[in-house]
Amino acid sequence: MGKIFDQEKRLEGTWKNSKWGNQGIIAPVDGDLKMIDLELEKKMTKLEHENKLMKNALYELSRMENNDYATWVIKVLFGGAPHGAK
């Protein structure tokens, strides 16, 4: 008899498929099974982290130097003026 997939647990890691290469994991999402591409998830996490670092650096530059360009970039990219900026 085959294994019963427990939808409450996530499968950790990837498996190697001779035809398609590394495969993602299957994880339950709102009761449905969904393939998760681990490499894509890692890239998205890295981009989100870099975005947060850039945003914090611009806020700090705008605050410390009262830099109008940094304030403008923050307004264009993030939709608002930093705290304490004009």
From Swiss-Prot:
One GO CC annotation: membrane
Transmembrane domains' residue ranges: none
Subcellular location field: Host membrane
Bilayer topology term: Peripheral membrane protein
Impact noted for substituting residue 78 to S: Unable to form multimers larger than tetramers
Ranges in coiled-coil conformation: 38-67
GO molecular function: RNA binding
Function: Protein that assembles into highly ordered structures and provides a specific site for viral DNA replication. Probably anchors the viral DNA replisome to the host membrane.
Family under the similarity heading: Belongs to the phi29likevirus DNA replication protein 1 family.
Name listed for the protein in its UniProt record: DNA replication protein 1
Gene designation: 1
